[in-house]
Amino acid sequence: MTSVLPTSPGSRQSYWAATRSPRYSLTFAVPLLLLYETLAVALNQGTGVGIRNGADVLLRSLAATLLGDRGPVLFGGLVALLLIVVAVRDLRRSSGGLRPRLFVLMLVESALLAVVFGFVVGVVTAQLVNALPLLTIGQAQPMEWPVVLMVSLGAGVYEELLFRVLLVSGLLLAARAILGLGTVAASIFAVTIGALIFSAFHYIGPYGDPLDLPSFVFRTIAGLAFSGLYVTRGFGITAWTHALYDVFLLAARG
């Protein structure tokens, strides 16, 4: 459905409606992807070990299966190209151009949401398991701060792409087609199962955390929150919020 946005740049309706559109949401995600890919290449040069975000590794493995040996190398570029193509297509259909000021506001919104999410998810987790999640989450194999930053940025792009765009959407289709659930029931099923898988994913691999109940509940609730944010605010805001959320959380853990 097409809507006519108010012409005033400061309009609240204009901001919420415009920034959820692909031309803003996907364009906003591109710098995050480029920052992650640049850091990943720089940090992995000459190390002999390729450290990347786990969701990125999983998606690149899938790309290798589909595209052969060049799949992992081409994958990041293909994701960036897809984001840009969809954003440009939406921009051409819109009546006006992009307003740079809105991207600044989107970054501020993402940072505020990251702080709020950390607090709210922590409080809810503490109520459910009677524990302080930031104190009980186990320490995985330690990483230097540049690596922490790189992995966190990758979480924003690739974990949202994998767990929200692909997994939750796939579960929603399966719940309707296979289980015969209605829209509301299928949505609850997809978001809940997706959040559980999202949480479990963080305990896999050499850099995964030791499994314990408080951290598992903490990440499950975070997965539910990010799914809700994705539905209401789109991919770009959710990706940046997730990335900054991870940076703040890992910084708090030292």
What is each stretch, according to the model?
Residues A29-I51, V121-G122, A126:
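Alpha-helical transmembrane segments of multi-pass membrane proteins
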Residues L91-G156, L172-L181:
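Juxtamembrane helix-loop-helix connectors linking adjacent transmembrane helices
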Residues L32-E37, F75-R89, V115-F119, L196-I197:
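Hydrophobic core of alpha-helical transmembrane segments in multi-pass integral membrane proteins
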Residues M1-S25, G50-G54:
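N-terminal juxtamembrane cytosolic/stromal segments of multi-pass membrane proteins
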Residues W145-G254:
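Transmembrane helix-loop-helix hairpins at the membrane interface
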Residues L59-A80:
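Interfacial helix-start motif at the membrane-water boundary
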Residues Q13-P31, L98-L112:
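Alpha-helical transmembrane segments and their helix-start/interface "positive-inside/aromatic belt" motifs
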Residues V49-L66, T136-A140:
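Perimembrane loop-to-helix junctions flanking transmembrane segments
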